[in-house]
Curated annotation (Swiss-Prot):
SUPFAM superfamilies: alpha/beta knot. It is an enzyme of class 2 (transferase). The keyword Transferase applies. The keyword Electron transport does not apply. It comes from Parasynechococcus marenigrum (strain WH8102). It catalyses: pseudouridine(1915) in 23S rRNA + S-adenosyl-L-methionine = N(3)-methylpseudouridine(1915) in 23S rRNA + S-adenosyl-L-homocysteine + H(+). This is Ribosomal RNA large subunit methyltransferase H.
């Protein structure tokens, strides 16, 4: 997994400082990872902004409650199988993603069957990206 080939497209701003601190901690550990903030709006306007931000060659991974729930090791393996593809992780707003965006995704992923604030989902995703990299590199960060 190459962080410089990954982008996170997330609706809304991170307002809680402790979440922002966590995101920055992992961003430093994942040089090249790009986070694009999409302005909060209606689901259709958010979808328009997300579509406009997606690149044609990106493998789209939509984060959604009803997506596939996988553990950290299978997540790392799946990212490894994607090789050098460019990845776009998409986190919707409070109302989630439109059906069109869900259908466009190459993979629908759930971080948990529980519901979390979207800014916390962003922190959880970036930590899992770092963990996936650590797993693939054999780092002691991940202790199963």
């Amino acid at each position: 997994m190459n962080p410089s080939r990954c982008r996170i497209l997330a609706v809304g701003k991170v307002r809680r400082s402790w979440i922002q601190d966590g995101i920055e901690l992992y961003r430093k550990r994942l040089p090249g990872l790009e986070i694009i903030e999409i302005r909060d709006s209606t689901p259709d306007k958010e979808a328009d902004s997300i579509r406009a931000s997606l690149r044609p060659n990106e493998h789209v991974i939509a984060l959604m409650e009803e997506g596939d729930a996988v553990g950290s090791i299978p997540f790392a393996r799946r990212l490894d199988q994607l090789g050098n593809q460019r990845l776009a992780f998409v986190i919707g707003g409070a109302d989630g993603l439109t059906n069109e965006l869900k259908g466009r995704a190459h993979w629908q992923l759930s971080l948990s069957p529980m519901t979390f604030p979207h800014e916390l989902a962003r922190l959880m995703l970036i930590e899992q990206l770092f963990r996936a990299q650590a797993i693939l590199q054999g780092s002691p960060y991940h202790r199963a």
